Each structure stands twice: as structure tokens, then as C-alpha cells.
Amino acid sequence: MQYHIKDQTLIIKGDFEAVSTGLNGGRARVEYIFNKQVPRTFNPPSPEEFIREEARKDGIETASLGLLTAVNMEYLQVIEDDYMTAFITAGVSNCSEFRAKAGTINIILVSKARLSETALFGAIITATEAKGLALLEKGYNFLGTNTDAVIVAYETCSDSGPKSKTNQEIPYAGSSTEFGKKITEAVIKGIKAGLELRGE
């Protein structure tokens, strides 16, 4: 896996099995995952077409999954451990309608070990739980914003991480599992650090 920031877009390149809750999301095998900054006034006629066009502009011509955020990439948090690399942008100027004022929290988790289908989807739940906990611990009275999204992926040809020792995929990603605990730690750390940098 390689990643860089180009024109306020985080671009992650590799060979991934992934699932996304973002625009044009779903389950896919992709070569690129990206998180693009857009203006706070962002309101295109077709967000789905916009994200496809922006991918092309960034030189992404093959299969990809992408997210959008109003958060500047200078606030991007990258957290790596033996299990995964987490990429997190956090802002709370767009909170859920049933709570206060709002932003966007985007979470991208790239596992170094193969994930079962159960773990791939379960990691979304664990990351979302951790996001809510981070906000509550920061003193907010809401659990997220109305534009939040999560991408969970694993590298199909990775030979690093726990898989290299056990030669087995990670079966589950619930918050009580070792992998789930790592997700929780990374997400809480990344969200808190990102918000603090923005003075939120």
C-alpha cells in the first residue's frame, strides 16, 4: 500500500477488497481509495457523478472507492499499528439533525491481514461505535454527523501483520476482539486529535 496527498485529496493505492458506506459505495475490489476535500458550500446536482469525475481528474482511472469531506487534509490523522493503518478526517460542523450543529467524520481502515466477510462488515460497526464514544468523551451530545462515512479494506497481497504469523484471516471485528480493540483505539485517537487540531 502507498498513499499520498494530491490537491487536497488523500489517495491510497494498492490492491484491496473493500466495503464503503460513502457515495458510490458498496462492496468492491479496488486499486484506489480516496478522501477528497470539497468546499463547505458543496452541493452538486449529482454527488455520485461528481465523485466519479473528481477521481478521473486525480488520475484515478481504475476501480476506486471515495469519500468527500470539508475538512482540510492538513488535519488528516494517520494511525498505524501491527493490524492496520487508519486514515481519519474529523469535523463536527454538520452534526446529525437530531442533535446540534454539524461537519464530516470520514474513517478509512486498511487492514494488514485478510478479513472474513463478517469482519469486513463488522469493522464498520466497531468503527462507528468508537466514533460515537470519541465524541461523547469530547463532551459532544451527538454521535456523528449526517455525512459521516466509513471504508474498511484489506490488502489482498499483504504479507505483513498478524496474518503473516498465523496464515489465517481475521474472522471477527467486534469491539471485544483483538482487532476490534485496535479499531476502537485508532478511531478514538484519530478523531480526538483531528478535532483538537481544528479547535473543535
Curated annotation (Swiss-Prot):
InterPro entries: AdoCbi_amidolase (IPR002808), CbiZ (IPR052209). GO terms for molecular function: adenosylcobinamide hydrolase activity. The keyword Hydrolase applies. It catalyses: adenosylcob(III)inamide + H2O = (R)-1-aminopropan-2-ol + adenosylcob(III)yrate. It comes from the Archaea. Pathway: Cofactor biosynthesis; dicyanocobinamide salvage pathway. Keywords: Hydrolase. It is an enzyme of class 3 (hydrolase). The keyword Hydrolase applies. Its EC number is 3.5.1.90. Converts adenosylcobinamide (AdoCbi) to adenosylcobyric acid (AdoCby), an intermediate of the de novo coenzyme B12 biosynthetic route. Belongs to the CbiZ family. This is Adenosylcobinamide amidohydrolase. It comes from Methanosarcina mazei (strain ATCC BAA-159 / DSM 3647 / Goe1 / Go1 / JCM 11833 / OCM 88) (Methanosarcina frisia). The gene is cbiZ.
